[in-house]
Curated annotation (Swiss-Prot):
SUPFAM superfamilies: PFL-like glycyl radical enzymes (SSF51998), R1 subunit of ribonucleotide reductase, N-terminal domain (SSF48168). Residues 1-92 form the ATP-cone domain. This is Ribonucleoside-diphosphate reductase large subunit. One of its GO terms (biological process) is deoxyribonucleotide biosynthetic process. ATP binds at K5, R6, E11, N12, V13, M14, F15, D16, K17, T53, D57, K88. GDP binds at S202, S217, N427, E431, T603, A604, S605, T606. InterPro entries: ATP-cone_dom (IPR005144), NrdE_NrdA_C (IPR013346), RNR_lg_C (IPR000788), RNR_lsu_N (IPR013509), RNR_R1-su_N (IPR008926), Rrm1 (IPR039718). Pfam families: ATP-cone, Ribonuc_red_lgC, Ribonuc_red_lgN.
Length: 771
């Protein structure tokens, strides 16, 4: 049997050569548990005559990855094999790769079509020796298999569908793309990115340094006008943003309801549903453009709008397709008055914004005055019990996981952009709270901090966290100035108000590394101190930028300009971790360069790249399934697998019991200290999750994407959760509702004979990668 090498030559397949290649990549791994010979034997069984070395490496990596239930180091080995394969297929020098990307010629028309920008190329040409010398390619080998495969699939740049970038090339491209001629800052950013202290958001990783450097994640729009012109002009804005893979939040509360009079045609309006079908089809059309991450929209509506009941049905699984929008997400922008009426079992008046104008433009007491005025004047379309609307909201959430819930009054009352006007919606993922109007489209650039990295020698390093936050602020602030904006209204807004969004990933990993149960008092205290540090560091960096460059244009009149910070708006006194009064004095003197700073977002893709748990979430399971070309296999929480392996508690019976129990270890005979630390989200009281969100909320000047997890949701459970979050002053009451299926799928992958009453075995576990 022969293999075809990269140079086209044939060579006999040699078992020893395969084993040797695997063994070379096992440096630093736990050799008590990693068995290169077993992997090589499985590879030999899976190859065919004429297999290429690239295919051989791919198969070897996948086989190693399937062994991750034996030991987490197998995931690192799998990644090393895949990375080694990529290194053999790509050029080493960063400058050479950038030159190839810049010199790209479209094969269909023969035209020069540079993939990276001319300024990026100019910077690389001037500093190529320095940039080439500081790149450390060994850091590519630190990714786990799934992180690396995520990079391969969507992030590393390609020429004619062939990957030409290595992960380190991508990170240096991002750093140079942001900092351009400031080469020292570029190298500082590169090192922090490649050491995994933080990551920029996906659009920045995709596009920094390229010819279309659209690096922003979030765009917030209001419907420009309740007219054909306004609706379709807004649709065009959405299409142009979606084309550049931006996520959209759109407020439609000013669009007249169904049955309302249209003076121009002497007819009646069809309401928001047919209009949203048009938006839905636009989202589907843009989706066909081959974007790495197609743009999607969340539609925001206030619950007084008389089309509210039809709106709540938009994503349901049954009903007339003409009344469904499967490709849009829906969210409610809820005033406090509605929550009070639900609580008091009061009546709720449904209104048309054409006949009851201005409700979307006011909040708090002013909203209540205007709304009750319209009620007294009997301008409403209909009156129903507030709890009828509430029940429809809960039913929709139980069936579809949506609508998302945000509290209009908290969002406006606690915003440092309150001086700009009424904020009418959030973004796609409910963590961005920014002002927009007909002439301005709000934008936000994001990055997330890998909190697990700051657990050093059993302690959390707050000083290092503050230092990294300050680098992120400077980076995101630069992106505002150099970004490619899909529409001019976005550029106007972003350069006037200069908001940024700093989030986190790996909070659960940090707790585990410190041996803190997620719901422990120690974890709750650390949660507060982490976000206090992030907010402090972000303010300090933004103030230092303002000292050099001046405050943002609309700073005067903001809360911060009057010495009021986010925690003041929550009536919270910070800990003594940082000295806040001198910082407040400095802000009074120099101002801030950025209107908003902190916004914990979902981090699904980037957390997978870095091998961390998502955002501020606990682990949802301790075991889950991954699919690769060669089939499906199980992956175990690497922290749990490592501790069980070290304590000689890991075996097939444990693995099978965890799988039978849907990723839980609570029904095992494992030690109690392990059970406490490795509770899943389903085993942690949701009120604790909500309380921790409120605790950190005092240091989050935008908002946070907070999911609610209830295995078997009911009207009473969900109502209790929502009212608890509202009473604590949360801005985002709920992103998704996550539930468990009514019945678990049959566990075909398990050997039923092996599922016995669990007894922890203290004997040596098998160290080979057995099938």
């Amino acid at each position: 049997m022969f293999v075809i090498k990269r140079n086209g030559y044939k060579e006999n397949v040699m078992f020893d050569k395969i084993t040797s290649r695997i063994r070379k990549l096992c440096y630093g791994l736990n050799t008590d548990h990693i068995d290169p010979i077993k992997i090589a034997m499985k590879v030999i069984q899976g190859i065919y005559n004429g297999v290429t070395t690239v295919e051989l490496d791919t198969l070897t990596a996948e086989i190693a990855a399937t062994c991750t239930t034996q030991h987490p180091d197998y995931a690192i080995l799998a990644a090393r094999i895949a990375v080694s394969n990529l290194h053999k297929e790509t050029k080493k020098l960063f400058s050479e790769v950038m030159k190839d990307l810049f010199n790209y010629v479209n094969p269909k028309n023969g035209k020069h079509s540079p993939i990276i920008s001319s300024i990026t190329m100019d910077v690389v040409n001037k500093y190529k020796d320095k940039l080439n010398s500081v790149i450390i390619y060994e850091r590519d080998f630190s990714y786990n298999y799934f992180g690396f495969k995520t990079l391969e699939k969507s992030y590393l740049l390609k020429i004619n569908n062939k990957i030409v970038e290595r992960p380190q090339h991508m990170l240096m491209r991002v750093a140079v793309g942001i900092h351009q001629w400031d080469i020292d800052s570029a190298i500082e950013t590169y090192n922090l990115l490649s050491e995994k202290w933080f990551t920029h958001a996906s659009p920045t990783l995709f596009n920094a340094g390229t010819s279309r450097h659209q690096m922003s994640s979030c765009f917030l729009l209001n419907m420009m006008d309740d007219s054909i012109e306004g609706i379709y002009d807004t649709l065009k804005r959405c299409a142009l943003i979606s084309k550049m893979a931006g996520g959209i939040g759109l407020s439609i509360s000013n669009i007249r309801a169904s049955g309302s009079y249209i003076s121009g045609t002497n007819g009646a309006s069809n309401g928001i549903i047919p209009m949203l079908r048009v938006y839905n089809n636009t989202a589907r059309y843009i989706d066909q453009g081959g974007n790495k991450r197609p743009g999607v929209m969340t539609i925001y509506l206030e619950p007084w709008h008389s089309d509210i009941m039809a709106f709540l049905d938009l994503k349901k699984n049954t009903g007339n397709e003409e009344h469904r929008t499967r490709d849009l997400f829906i969210a409610l922008w809820i005033p406090d008055l509605f929550m009070k009426r639900v609580k008091d079992d009061g009546e709720w008046s449904l209104m048309c914004p054409d006949e009851c104008p201005g409700l979307d433009n006011v909040w708090g007491d002013e909203f209540e005055r205007l709304y009750t005025l319209y009620e007294r004047e009997k301008r409403y379309k209909s009156i129903i019990k507030a709890r009828v609307v509430w029940k429809a909201i809960i039913e929709s959430q139980i069936e579809t996981g949506t609508p998302f819930i945000l509290y209009k009054d908290a969002c406006n009352k606690k915003s440092n952009q309150q001086n700009l006007g009424t904020i009418k919606c959030s973004n796609l993922c409910t963590e961005i709270i920014q002002y927009a109007d007909a002439n301005e489209v709000a934008v936000c650039n994001l990055a997330s901090i890998a909190l697990n990295m700051f657990v050093i020698d059993g302690q959390f390093d707050f000083l290092k966290l503050k230092d990294v936050v300050k680098v992120i602020v400077r980076n995101l602030n630069k992106i505002i100035d150099i970004n490619y904006y899909p529409i001019p209204e976005a550029e106007i807004s972003n350069k006037r108000h200069r908001p940024i969004g700093i989030g986190v990933q790996g909070l659960a990993d940090a707790f585990i590394l410190l041996n803190y149960p997620f719901d422990s008092l120690e974890a709750q205290d650390l949660n507060k101190k982490i976000f206090e540090t992030i907010y402090y560091g972000a303010l300090e960096a933004s103030c230092e930028l303002a000292e050099k460059e001046g405050p943002y244009d609309t700073y005067v009149g903001s809360y911060a300009s009057n010495g009021i910070l986010q925690y003041d708006l929550w009536n919270v006194v910070p800990s003594d971790l940082w000295n806040w009064e001198p910082l407040k004095d400095k802000i009074r003197t120099y101002g801030l360069r950025n209107s908003l700073l902190v916004a914990p977002m979902p981090t699904a893709s980037t957390a997978q790249i870095l091998g961390n748990n998502e955002s501020v979430e606990p682990y949802t399971s301790n075991i889950y399934t991954r699919r690769v070309l060669s089939g499906e296999f199980q992956v175990v929480n690497p922290h749990l697998l490592r501790v069980l392996t070290e304590r000689k508690l890991w075996n097939d019976e444990i693995k099978n019991r965890i799988m039978v129990d849907g990723g839980s270890i609570q029904n095992t005979n494992l030690p109690e200290d392990i059970k406490r630390v490795y509770k899943t989200i389903w085993e942690i009281p949701q009120k604790t999750i909500i309380k921790m969100a409120a605790d950190r909320g005092a240091f989050i000047d935008q908002s946070q994407s907070m999911n609610i997890h209830i295995a078997d949701p009911s009207y009473s459970k969900l109502t209790s959760m929502h009212f608890y979050g509202w009473s604590l002053g949360l801005k985002t009451g709920m992103y998704y509702l996550r539930t468990k299926p009514a019945s678990a799928p049959i566990q075909f992958t398990l050997d039923k004979d092996k599922i016995k009453p669990l007894v922890v075995c203290d004997s040596e576990i098998c160290t080979s990668c057995s099938g």
